Amino acid sequence: MHTLRWARGLSPVLLAWCAGVAVQLQQTALWPAAAYGAVAGLALVILGWSRAAGLHRHMSICTAALLLSFACTGGHALLQVRVIDPALEGQDLELVGVVQAMPQRQDIGWRFRFEVETAHRVDGGQAVTVPRKVYLGWYGQDGVSDSGWNLSALPEPVQAGERWRLRARLKAPHGNMNPRGFDYELWLWEQGIGATGTVRTGAAHPPPLRLGQTWMHPVEWWRQSVRDRLQNRLGTGDAGVAGIVVALVTGDQAAIDRSHWDVFRATGVAHLMSISGLHVTMFAWLAAVSVAWGWRQSALWGFKGALRWPAPQVGAVAGLGLAVLYAVFSGWGVPAQRTVWMLGVVVLLRLSARQWAAGHVCLLAAAVVLTLDPWALLQPGFWLSFVAVAVLLWTDQRRSGMHPVGASGAPAWCPVWMYSWLRRGWGLLREQSVVTLALAPLCLLFFGQVSVVGLLANLVAIPWVSFVVTPLAMLGVLWPGLAVLAAWALQPLTVLLVWMAAWPGASVQLALPPWGFAALALCAALLWVSAVPRAWKVASLSLLWPALFWTAPRPAMGTYELLITDVGQGNAVLVRTAKHSLLYDAGPRYSAESDAGHRVLVPLLAQTAEKLDVLMLSHRDSDHTGGAAAVLAMQPQVLLSSSLESEHLLWGMASSSTLCSRGQSWVWDGVRFEVLHPALDGSESSVSTRKPNSLSCVLRISDGVHSALLAGDIEAPQEQALVAVGLEPVDLLLVPHHGSKTSSTPEFLAALQPRLALVQAGYRNRFGHPAPAVLARYEAMGTRVIDSPHCGAATWRSDAPEQVLCERERSLRYWHHRPP
């Protein structure tokens, strides 16, 4: 009882500690170290003053815990990473260093972490200081393929632990910023990466020089060796299944095909297909059971130490130690770290003979995890892991208290062994259903998707992957033939999952609700799995209503909204009226497995449950059509309007399509849409022989008072043609050709007289967009210029034409890059 009472008294302190971490993560800029030291000193002063007993003493301790965790998290952040000096961005530097982690293979080269030892300027030779950890891309030579890289001149393989001398061009860690999108800059911050860049190749630069293999990062070297051996052994089979085996052994999630990830998410088994908490826990359990059994047997063989230390405790410690080794080998990912810390808490409590409730155990583990990795609090996996484990521990404790362990109570007609297995099966089914129900609101909040078939799929997949596939895959490191068996065992499971994912209503896509609505839904789910009266459970259904039926607010009738997304070097603009939506361009293709459609547009459309009416692709360049295939697959009902040549593959992916041409117009909800270019008549009817930029679809949008012009990649001749036929002034202009010096002519701007000019371009892109001369031209007219590197995604509404909401400003935190 004293132990339980002590744990209950500690819980408010742990909650306060976690709250202090959460508060610090809201800071937009870090304070000086002295300020955090002062906060820590204040916490100690409060503890010194708290001599009164009772509530006031507990409140002062909780307040001190909150302040102290705030200060510790701030101090941790100050030590986390040092960003590159802006003066060194874009400069050619000679770097010597070691490949720190297992490189990731892409279709155009390698991506890898590089631990810099020395850095010098190329132009002067003087030594410079750069961040210790940088993230580099080494690609083929410039200028041949559609993506800008020569796929026939790919770089040689890179091995973890190798020391290289190479020439690179670095820049600050910078990622796309879109509403509730993936925070790439946070991911880089967590990894301690202070710069990204590319290895310079081509005739103008000396080739990178391998200086030799070092003994640094031996675990990463071993992981890469295992990965390469598995890929070579399984390469002749199904590439997708081989990638899953590689991911289960080494934690390399990039080895899994994107199509398989889509199936796993739709069936709710994505957590099984990479090194997750479940795998680490299963490994620890098997290790603990095996070591405990061996420890007991050693007593029979005369080992006296087995009589001194109990087998359960030895097994628990050994299981924890082996789980740490497994997690380290898998790459020490955040999910594996969380599980290791939670297992460590459980083992320590067992060694100290303390019995804590499930909530207290999870709370202590959460406090430990957040102390070591505060930014885990912002990851969906943190919440999914802890809620799942807490629910499982709680239901297990409640069931243990209600039903003693054993097979007593079996009916006379049922053998004891059968009754025992039936009880175990029913317990597995119940636990899986409880976890699925409890996690559904969180899945809706984070992903906008709930798998309806997830319960059934996990009932098959969890035991099959955990007790058949993963052990075979791990043993395949020693005996490669077993890895082949693991791949064979995966094939029927993947076929089953693909079939289930194709069921009507296999998964439900809903708009991402606000945090408050999701919290209400989570409360309802927890009530349903709790031992509360049935009337309470029925009443809790009302808490689900706001999350299930929430819809994103839309523009008022007669007005419209533009969301100029942040997709890097490319165009993608979402236009919304009261009841209709149009997507202008679909962003760039980043690589064979990555494009703006999958990374930005599909999640963006899903989070508001957006149904597109029209997808207008201005022209065929890949920085405008790169994500179109993903959008068309997600939105099969959409009308494709473009100037693509007739043989282009995208025409065949659309259920309905039309060429965009001058003179086309329509009205949605009191808002007029008009195509101003191209004029496809006479010699211009053959789009395949024309320069793509000259065929850009130019769209004008107006509510009768305020207007916007989306200009694609038109250049000076097309601008002059538009001026000749007459242009009306606009409030907002999507700057032609990303601000290239071949566009935005003075006559064109004089005719439009835009108040706002939006530039969609990548940060420090290799084309130099927007050109300084073009920016000066806009500024001389008094036009306010906003670009995506500084703004992120920009939202503009016709009923508030002077305001632009920048996602980078709205979501700014101290780890985010502030471009100069």
Q: What are these model-derived regions, one by one?
A:
Residues 1-90, 341, 416-420, 424:
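Helix-loop-helix transmembrane hairpins and adjacent membrane-interface loops
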Residues 1-14, 293, 447, 462, ...:
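Membrane-anchoring/interfacial helices and their immediately flanking loops
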Residues 2-4, 61-271, 594-595, 599-603, ...:
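Membrane-interface helix/helix-cap signal primarily in integral membrane proteins
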Residues 5-50, 379-382, 482-529:
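Membrane-embedded alpha-helical segments of integral membrane proteins
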Residues 12, 20, 197, 257-455, ...:
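Hydrophobic alpha-helical transmembrane segments in multi-pass membrane proteins
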Residues 20, 97, 381, 439, ...:
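Residue-level signal for inorganic ion chemistry
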Residues 110, 154-156, 160-163, 167, ...:
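Non-globular, low-confidence helical/coil segments that flank catalytic cores
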Residues 215-234, 244-245, 252, 260, ...:
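Hydrophobic alpha-helical segments of integral membrane proteins
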